[in-house]
Amino acid sequence: METSQIRNGFNKVEVDVVGPLKDLLVRVMKNINTPFKILNETFKINYCDQQETKTKSSFYIQTLDANDKSSLELTKSAIKNIQMQQQQQQQQQQQQQQQQHHDIFQFTQPSSSHNHSNHHHHHHQQQLQQQQQQQLQQQMKTPKLLFFIVMSVGVGKSYIKNIKEEAGTIPILEWFTNYIRSWEEVFKLTSNQVTSHIKRQLLTKACTTGNINLLDEILLSGISKEQIKETQTIGHGIILKSLIVNNLDSIVVSGSMSLLGAVIDNDNDKKGSSLILSKLNLNLFPKSIITACFNLAELDLSYNNIKEIPKEICQLKHLKILNMNNNQLDDLPLELANLTNLKYLAVQDNPLNKFPHHIIEQGTKRTLVFLKNIIEGKKSETWNKVKLMFVGQEGVGKSSLCKALMGSRRRSSSSFAAELQKSGDTISTEGVKIQSIKGKKIDFYAWDFGGQQVFYPTHQFFLTNQALYLLVFKLTDPNFAERVNYWTLQIKANSGLSVPMIFLVGTHCDACTPEQLSSAEQILKENFVKYSRIRQNAISFVSCTNGTGIKELKKILTNEAEKSNLIKSNIPGSYLILEQRLTDRGANSSRILINQNNINQNNNNNNNNNNHNNCNNNENCTTTAATAGTTTMTSTTTTTTNYSNENILNTSSNSLIALFTRSNSNSNLSNNYQKPLVNQKYIDYNDFERECKLSHLAQEEIQGATEFLHNMGIILHYDTPILRSLVVLDPQWLADVMSSLITFSHNWIKNGILNHSELVSIWSGKYDQSIWPSLLKLLEKFEVSYELPNEFPSRSLIPSLLPEEPIDRIQEIKEKLWIPLPEAIESKRVQIFGCQYNFDFMPLGFFPRLLLRILLIKGIDIKTYWANGILLDILTTEDIKIQKLNHKKHSILPNNSSSTSSSTSSSTSSSTSSSSSSSTSSSSTSTTTTTVQIQSSPFGNSTTIVNKLTNIDNNNNNNNNNNNNNNNNNNINNNNNNNNNNNNNNNNNNNNNNNNNNNNNNNNNNIKNIINNFENQNNLNNIITNNFGGKFEIIKKNDFESPLSSKKPKHQVLVTFKNQKSFESKDKDTYKLNVEIRSFNVSNNNDKDFLASLFFQQLLSTIDTLLSGSYGGLKVTRLIPCIHCIEKDPHSEPHLFDINSCISQLLLGKSQLVCGKDSTTPVRIDYIAPDLSIKKIPILLEDQVVCEEQIGVGGFGLVHKGKLILQDKSLVVAIKSYIVGNSSASDIIRKFQEFHHEMYIMSSLNHLNIVKLFGSMQNPPRMVMEFAPHGDLYHFLEKKKNIKWSFKVRLMLDIAKGIEYLQNQNPPIVHRDLRSPNIFLFSLDENAPVCAKVADFGLSQQSLYSVSGLLGNFQWMAPETIGAEESYTEKIDTYSFSMILFTILTGECPFDEFTSFGKMEFIRKIREEDLRPTIPSDCPPTISNLIELCWSGDPKKRPHFSYIVKELTNFYYNLNLSPIPEQKSINDKSPHPDLISNGVPKLQIAK
């Protein structure tokens, strides 16, 4: 076949045109470039004149003149040539047959020499292959007549009929000169004929060379039965020669001929046939078997490299035997279950990494039933893997107990004791170690939790309620009850409402007397058994030295696991497939040996492998695949961690998904399979969802499967905004990463501060340096660490490693700044308030997480902090101005900094400064930029954070919000890049210690000179402290002076946490969080000094958010200390008021309480609980507000129209009243807190598209707000159907601007109840300054990380908020906004079109099937695209409101409308400007 490759990738086929009319045909067809396909190749036909090209093509077309009699002769001549070619081929075949008979005769004679025989066979085999190729090439070179073209170009007699008689079987095409589409007929016939000839040639080639893949492709493309039979005839001769040449040892082309024979048998309707295609090195399953051999009864494809069985195999209805042994199958299709006649399925020695191995081991019938149950959705599988949690203090024998439970049942106690003596009585565990304990019926996944207290904060991420807990303690410890008490409460807190299954296991019973054992048992029964669901067998005493009680404990564990619901007997088979697929990705990769008999042998192998791998600075891991079922399948492999090829998908702080890989080999089912696996430590949730769908899980089943595998310990997934995007496949790896920092075995993290330069000592050799920034970001997600911003060199805070109590420099700072309470009271210059949270229990790690969140609050000056406390100042307006001046005037460069790095550092600081300060603006050059940093060390005041709490220049801040967000993103990227550079520099520094020491000495001298010059210039009014890590900071001396040394206003805050000290303590509230605020040199009558109250409210919101999101199962009581008790006797404990009693008094219209210690002295509620009285807004008097007609009913009470009167002028307002009604006491308190919370949120808002709060009233509580003359959006759309597009877009834009303002607050404000009834209209004129405003902030929350809680009105709610009490972010408002857009667009409520669904069905479809309203077809693409983006099921894909406002603004202008009216300040838009000052009425605050 003559083809050539042309430039655009097509194959060119030359077709000669001969005969009298060739010029006409070539001229017409030369511009035809239509491509066509033969198999997977694309061809184009080139019609050419042989005389012009001087070449001879493989194909030709004979043109004939229908009116010329000579055309008959041309036809006869062409036919004669064809007949001669056929005769030559027949002669060649006869000669071949004669040669075959001769060879058979020679073959039957005895051979004189074996070596000669081998040489003879080899020679003939080569000769045979050469002959086959030569014959094929000769056939391709012989020109083929495709067809005749007969044209009528003249006048006269037509010989067309005679030509057709002579042509015989050769096609004839009549060309009509008056038919302009004749060229299409020519091309169609040409391409068909060329395709037929080429396929015939390829078919012969496939059979002569044994290429089954090519044969399969040809059969699938379609070929005639005649061609198949013709090829089979040719192939029979080749097979015979193959038999002779190879001495019956092998058949060269038997596979292709077998397939060809099966196809012919199928065409003859022969049933029960078999097809053997083994040992042919096939990479693909021949699909032609399915389409052309559907009558097969037996199929053998063993010993190939097939990776997949096609789903279409179910069409082989008669198949009884399928042999796929020794292939590369990774999975089995569900469609195998539809082969009802299949009796034998052989898939041994395949990897099958994505299919449960134990199912296959149980045979064909079990496998087919398993697949069928998945198809039918039956839940009939059993999960016999139980999570076993070993918890307790260090040194009590947890690891030894775990090892004892893993021991062989036949080992004697003496041998067991000898083994323990070699390893020690106790084995120290850092973090969490995961092992497997094999039982007869149950496999236990043993999680051994490190008992050192330093690891306790990280344990919460691994504890689940679907587990058996072994609370291990040492019977010889006299204080064991305190250890048991902590862990029972910890487990209870993590179990939510369910009662956990706790086994109390005392070790070292061999060292105790019977009396001691009896006493311990009595203590446990009286105090701790009540916390466990296990009552009869909850207590066990064992000895890991002599094995006492071990066998009995294992039996108890097995029995209780069987009785409990931990062994799941009705789970979908798809769960097992999902587990296997995740195992292939990296899950279960850290399981330790389960077969005790192989421990010694495997250890020896590991040692040998480790010696071999010592040349690499990589991590050696021993992994075992733990399997269910009765057959133990153990694969112990030593793997070399190679992180040089890792793929970091995204290292940003918003979306961090890194793939950590290591090579591995799997020999579980295949001895010859050595495919390297990629073990990923964690994957993106979207990737996890894809695995779920490949495991045959429906979308609505994914959440249940995720929770199941999480509770079973296979994966870790936390449905919180920060962690939702991650699925941890290897919990052991995560525990190792955490314990690598939070550990007792190194000294690089000093007092909770980690210099990133020390990561070389911690992570070098374990994790590739390129992923260190990603690991730090991952630890931030789990609130284990926090990377300090604007640090050079970079550092991170590890809160759990801070000193437990103030020591050394921390203690010195605290004593100087936080003076004793009696001294402060005696000065008569301080006002004190605060609160106390009491908990029945609080797991370790609570305050470190709270500390991280407090550090993110703006408007504070951190003085120092430790593991259970933080001391800070609330910045005043004057403080902010002084800080700005100090940062501009004085700057000390970090150690080893050059002028270039200085500029970079300043620029970075500038970005952060502008984003965190409401009053800081960027300068034109980096050298004059104000540097604002966060406190980087607990040892001194070096940093300041400025917040909008100061209310300075709010308008400027609003305008700069978008720029600040961009700066923040850039700053994050810069920090990541700096981390990588710093890490690289650290390695270089380690290699050049001598040079660095010299450089450091020089730099230290330079620093000393700078210090001396600075102190001389500033008259020693400042000091310079050297925080470790080469960080020099300027600190004013008066920063560490007593607050009484100055008469300026000062606000101090001390937050401390107290743990339970003794189990025997009689105090029920032994876990306390105390907040104390001291305001010096301020007056209660000074309405400008409300900063302390505002910060107090934000701090309480931060605490409440953490408690509700992560510790919702704990009982919390909030108490308020009596300030009169404190003032009267600061040495004694004050009376404590319950917060509910304060609220109850306020609801009764009373502003005072009575002290429990002194009933004669009233206590003002606004003094002791300023968060319950919003000082930022005026308290209006009764004669200043006139209440008129009722205009609505709110969630808390009634809404009236009224007037705000002052100096004979009035302003129409809306009055929202809190009405108690017949609610329960708890509902009354809750609703009041929400009502009050709405006032708190609104008091800090100042935007034209947010309804303004003018003031509040008491008895009953009321809010006085702006009045919307045109009502709410819901009723407006309900009444008015025809709305101009211009006004629709204006409404959309106004609402978007209001929400954008909310989300740009710091922290962002989440409305949580955005819907059309909460949007109010102030003008129906699209050219008015304001048309729409957002209102009703009763459910709003400020979100540092996330908010949580159940919500209603599911039609408007984001999927992540419906029907589940989980955390979410401000992106839920973006989703609700899409529903508002839809409502404005259509005039209808969301989902009104769906009338056949009940509420629960609605919720399920919204959450699980992405059900959304139908956008009208005439909706402009800009608006429809915006709606679809905003209602994305993935919160991360929903756009920021800056983008939404931009899109709507551009769309507004593109409508050729008038420009959007400039929105003026509230002062200008008010009908009575003299009533308003800074957005607040000029009113006298009521006393």
Swiss-Prot record:
Region annotation (Disordered) ranges: 108-134, 891-1007, 1464-1487
Catalytic-site annotation from UniProt: 1313
Positions annotated to bind GTP: 392-399, 448-452, 507-510
Assigned keywords, A-Z: ATP-binding, GTP-binding, Kinase, Leucine-rich repeat, Nucleotide-binding, Repeat, Serine/threonine-protein kinase, Transferase
Boundaries of every COR domain copy: 678-872
GO biological process: signal transduction; sorocarp stalk morphogenesis
Uppermost EC category: transferase
CDD domains referenced in this protein's UniProt entry, alphabetically: RocCOR, STKc_MAP3K-like
Alphabetized Gene3D superfamilies for the sequence: P-loop containing nucleotide triphosphate hydrolases, Phosphorylase Kinase, domain 1, Ribonuclease Inhibitor, ROC domain from the Parkinson's disease-associated leucine-rich repeat kinase 2, Transferase(Phosphotransferase) domain 1, Winged helix-like DNA-binding domain superfamily/Winged helix DNA-binding domain
PROSITE patterns listed in its UniProt record: LRR (PS51450), PROTEIN_KINASE_ATP (PS00107), PROTEIN_KINASE_DOM (PS50011), ROC (PS51424)
Biased composition (Polar residues): 932-950
Compositional bias of kind Low complexity: 897-931, 951-1007
Listed SUPFAM superfamilies: L domain-like, P-loop containing nucleoside triphosphate hydrolases, Protein kinase-like (PK-like)
Protein name listed in UniProt: Probable serine/threonine-protein kinase roco11
Annotated source species: Dictyostelium discoideum
This protein's encoding gene: roco11
